[in-house]
Amino acid sequence: MHKPTIEEDLTEEEFIELVLAEQQKALAEDRQQRIQGKKPKKQRPIVKWIIWSMAFVLFFNTFALLFQIYTIPAIEFLKVSTRLSAQEDIQLYKKAVVEVSTGSSKGTGFAISHDGLVVTNDHVVDNAQTLSVVFPEKGIFEAELVESYPEVDLAVLQVQGDDFPALELAQNPSFTKNERVYFIGNPLAFTGIANEGILLETTLLEDWPETVMMMQAPVYKGNSGSPVLDEKGQVIGIIFATMKKEPYGRVGLFVPIQVLHNLRQ
């Protein structure tokens, strides 16, 4: 049995350490290229945009100087998101992925019906005094908790309205090791970040009634409630945590969508 961590709680100090480590790596590679007589790779416009975006975010925390180098592999997940978000299908899926806010914290959720049913994690909305969700294009709405399944960390919210964008839920999906999957969420200080991962295997957590799926993927604080999508764009699971698991290292965890189907029958 293993105890999961509710998301990968990447603190500001840990993030800075990660950036500094990658900065030194990038500078070392640059020096090696110069020694070998090679010209360093020129910065692409999209890389410049990413770097300046990150510098702006951390400027108010006095860390902008850390981003005055030409490449930062530590923000690879932003580069991947930019690449994936250029795809029409990913753009469509992102419209149904929302930011769930309780006033004091935030997470991710996604609409599963055009009349405003939203799935998220129970720990995202637990003890919330107020609830709201923000759709990328339709804006902010008040939400009501209508279903709660704390034993598997799932919750369903209701937003008043209609014609909401929604994701399709897979029916009895199969999981194949090393299969590529996609997920969309609001990690760290960002919103609408698309990323990809690789399916690993199932695991049974301590005090959990159902097995959950592990995936090799960059899951961070704020990704709780993110939908995991297969190649067809159907939701096969809901991210809720990370944990360390040998021999994979830190892995993302998601509740298989069939668990939600069974609970809502």
Where are these regions (language model features)?
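Intrinsically disordered, low-complexity boundary segments flanking structured domains
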Residues: 84-88, 169-170, 181, 186, ...
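Conserved beta-strand elements flanking the ATP-binding pocket of the protein kinase catalytic core
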Residues: 101, 144-146, 216
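N-terminal activation segment of mature serine protease catalytic domains
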Residues: 34-35, 42-52, 56-134, 263-265
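N-terminal positive-inside, membrane-proximal cytosolic segments immediately preceding the first
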Residues: 20-46
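C-terminal cap/linker of serine protease catalytic domains
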Residues: 4-6, 15-18, 37, 44-47, ...
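Conserved active-site neighborhood of the chymotrypsin/trypsin-like protease fold
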Residues: 105-106, 113-185, 189-192, 209-210
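Active-site region of chymotrypsin-like
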Residues: 92-98, 159-166, 193-265
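N-terminal targeting leaders characterized by basic, low-complexity, disordered sequences
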Residues: 1-29
